[in-house]
Design a protein with these regions (language model features):
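Noncatalytic alpha-helical scaffold of FAD-dependent oxidoreductases
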Residues: 1-170
């Protein structure tokens, strides 16, 4: 954050004299995982473990069951499982990894699946077709519109929180 860079010893008098931008090529392959959890706590606690295990996802989205239900009603199709093996799903992670080839991604997905299952995930579902990926991200992307369609009261719907502050924020 540039704000945090200028706050501190220099305060508002600081001047950035040089900035280096590193441009990376677009990834050739991506894979998204839908990871259901029974409860919110184990779902939230799993997020920082991706980084601790050097899995480095491109995106990690935390979603509660109620918002998924609202979003799916809004887009008119169901994407996320509500129950698996008789266990009600209370929260989800939607995680995307990218890489240069599918062999590399398969290794990452295998490590990620092992880690999240150890942390209490009910299952790991791979959105392995363009339609499944599109539907999962469409449900995620329509949160705001779905909530606005159901209520006139809206505080914050889509916030960005540092990984180590998620539990505190919620």
């Amino acid at each position: 954050s540039l704000l945090n860079l200028t706050i501190g010893s220099e305060g508002p008098l600081g001047i950035i004299t040089e900035l280096t931008l590193k441009v990376l090529p677009a990834p050739k392959e991506t894979v998204s995982l839908i990871i259901p959890f029974e409860g919110l706590d184990e779902c939230i606690a799993t997020v920082p473990k991706f980084m601790k295990n050097s899995l480095n996802p491109q995106a990690v989205e935390f979603m509660e069951r109620e918002i998924i239900l609202s979003s799916e009603r809004f887009i008119g199709r169901s994407t996320f499982p509500k129950q698996i093996g008789g266990i009600d799903v209370g929260a989800y992670l939607l995680v995307t990894f990218d890489g240069e080839d599918m062999d590399q991604l398969n290794d990452v997905v295998e490590k990620a699946a092992e880690m999240v299952l150890e942390e209490g995930a009910i299952d790991v579902l791979v959105a392995d077709t363009p339609n499944k990926k599109r539907d999962a991200w469409a449900a995620r992307s329509s949160f705001l519109e779905a909530i606005e369609a159901e209520t006139t009261w809206l505080d914050e719907c889509d916030v960005v929180v540092p990984i180590n502050k998620i539990a505190e924020f919620l």
